[in-house]
A protein has these predicted regions:
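Sec-dependent N-terminal signal peptides of Gram-positive bacterial secreted proteins and lipoproteins
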Residues: 3-22
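A composition-driven surface/loop motif
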Residues: 6, 22-284
Length: 284
């Protein structure tokens, strides 16, 4: 009996003494906002509420993805570091909560790189008054979206003036690479589908540049509305945002890495472009 009690006590002691990262497998977005930090010392930590753990490759999921959550994801990567995360069935819509409409569904920050792996069906919808992209690229390094298992989808929709994937209102976005997954990106009120956000009437275009789509990626990108009561220029499907207060549409940019460059000749009318699946690089 004493041996059994001793063994039980030892097991409990070991469980308590294990680092938090050894006990954490998945992070549930239902439980609150999640922040991932990749620091210059080579460490990556994940914070959610009072939980703070070392985790080099976290998976963020949701217990019931049929229900929208207004909780958000932030990734901050220091210079010369790469932050990694897997999205596995999250359904974030900060516009669905009246108290969270100024929040960004998913944003990246810092001077490092960010890698996102897709599993399952994922939705990122930033609140209307956030003026942000659905997946808001704020880091100055690269943003790469992968789908190694070929089972991931991502639907990203921007808030007012924001791109689907890329810059928020009055912000450019560059160095975006999509190598896999089925991606639908919708800009809002002049934001590009993938690329820059909307700019104001007297400002320069918010550029979307160095955008590469390759591998098994299937992408549908739709720029924000062209005409409404505010006379806003449409965002390109892939490229620059439009100009708000002036009917000037954003310009498309060449997309590197894909065999078939998207046809955006009718962008002003249709505000939509599709990229076909291919395994070969553009021009090869």
């Amino acid at each position: 009996m004493k041996r059994r009690l001793f063994a039980l006590a030892l097991a409990l002691l070991l469980a308590v003494s294990l680092p938090v990262s050894a006990l954490v497998r998945d992070w549930y977005i239902d439980d609150g906002d999640i922040t991932i930090n990749a620091t210059a010392d080579g460490k990556q930590t994940v914070k959610q509420g009072n939980k703070d753990a070392a985790d080099d490759d976290p998976t963020i999921t949701q217990r019931d993805s049929s229900k929208e959550t207004s909780n958000t994801i932030t990734i901050d990567a220091d210079e010369h570091t790469t932050a990694n995360v897997t999205l596995d069935g999250v359904n974030i819509n900060t516009d669905a909560d009246a108290n969270r409409r100024s929040e960004t569904a998913f944003r990246t920050e810092g001077e490092g790189d960010v890698n996102i792996e897709l599993d399952g069906s994922n939705t990122l919808w930033s609140g209307y008054s956030s003026n942000a992209a659905g997946l808001n690229k704020g880091n100055s390094g690269t943003l790469t979206i992968n789908d190694e298992d070929n089972n991931g989808t991502l639907e990203a929709t921007g808030g007012y003036g924001g791109a689907g994937i890329g810059g928020g209102q009055h912000s450019s976005a560059s160095d975006i690479t999509i190598t896999g997954g089925t991606i639908t990106a919708r800009g809002s009120n002049g934001g590009a589908g993938i690329g820059g956000g909307a700019s104001d009437i007297n400002g320069p275009y918010c550029n979307g540049s160095n955008i590469t789509i390759s591998g098994d990626a299937q992408v549908k990108a739709q720029g924000g509305t062209e005409h409404n009561e505010y006379n806003e220029g449409a965002g390109a499907g892939i490229g620059n945002g439009g100009k708000q207060g002036k009917n000037e549409a954003g310009k498309k940019v060449p997309v590197d890495g894909d065999k078939v460059e998207p046809d955006t000749s009718g962008l002003t009318e249709k505000r939509e472009t599709r990229i076909l699946r291919t395994r070969r690089g553009y021009g090869k």
